[in-house]
Amino acid sequence: VSLVLAIESPDQAEVTALLDCSDAYMAELYPPEGNFAVDLHALMQHDISFVVARLDGRAAGCGAIKWLTDGTAELKRIFVADDARGRGIGGRIMDFLEKLAKDRNVKHLFLETGPLNTEAVLMYRTRGFSQCGPFADYEDNPYSLFMTRDMTAGATSPEPVKQRVAS
């Protein structure tokens, strides 16, 4: 079993299907006014780097980083397919995105997630993210949890969790 992460275009049928699954998951948790996922067109802009995690060649997860101003960036659209969860893929996507941020000297990473995304919130907290106020164009609302991580405070990624990979 192999896991390969790379920057790819999100405009691929397999990847858009993954994004559709992410949208469906969010629609189960939050009303339309509480969903802030960027669409395919936005993900293809020059200020976004999009990563795909391929498990044995199949798109199993994705994530993006939006390059903001003044040494900041926002993590977006981090998602792992249901049948690929529990293998550390989300953490590997985070490792990849955090390395991209460090390579560009990003000082502060931000993200917006929902408080009902308990698995994601736990992963972000264990990686050094803490709650903050709204950033960029976001406004405070009951469906959003805003988080940030100081990339300059000697914060390092945790030791990789041993991956359980089914044979």
Give the label of every model feature segment.
Residues 70-72, 108, 144:
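A generic structural signal for beta-strand entry/edge sites
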